[in-house]
Amino acid sequence: MRNTLIHLALLAGAFVPAAVAQTSKSQAPKYPPIEEYLMPQPAEIALAKSGGPANISDRATIKVLTTSGFTVVHQGDNGFVCMVMRGFSAPTYTPAQFRDLVYDSSVRAPICFDPKAAKEVMPYYELRTKLAMERKSPDEITEGVQAAYARGELPKRDGVSFAYMWSADQNLGSGIGHWHPHVMVFAPYYDNSMVGGNTFGAPLPQLSDDAGTPFAVVVIPVDHNLFVKAEAK
């Protein structure tokens, strides 16, 4: 079943470039200067730590974005990794309308990966970031991710893992903005029917990204009292 789904995803991706070729380059979105995606390091560290509860983030490894990609600025001891994702971490396949978030330099999405997700999922987001920083289009990013996964250059996802996204200072981009504090569940091959078929954007568990693929993400909103405010030290 998994091999079939991967094959279907690869076939779907194969048709994307043809559609893009019909759109003139003048109409295609453009990347802002990379400097617009960057932050002062103290502010980024504080924002990254706001991704999860203090008992997690205070002992987590912290990564920040540089012109060379994400780099470790603090080594933790609990296996969690916190960082601030940018629009580069947009869905690879669906919802299609959010794939262009790669061009939105305002996105700031603090996240704290659990130890399993730090090993299996974070490299996927770091690859997406690398490709976007090379000015690849969403379709070229999809092709790069597919190829890397097929070659075994990205970890295979053999089970569910999760991440906290509890920051009160999150900006998830145009059309979403500031959403509920939530838990990201990385659930390979899930679709929305498997979590109740809830409406996208509702304050209920839902499949948010890349349904039916190895990169599927379920989001589970939590109480607003759990929001964590970024505090620079």
Indicate residue ranges for each PLM-predicted region.
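Positively charged n-region of N-terminal signal peptides that target proteins for export
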Residues: 1-4
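Bacterial N-terminal signal peptides
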Residues: 7-16
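Sec/Tat signal peptide C-region and signal peptidase I cleavage site
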Residues: 17-21
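Primary mode marks residue(s) on the alpha4-beta5-alpha5 output face of response regulator receiver
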Residues: 23-233
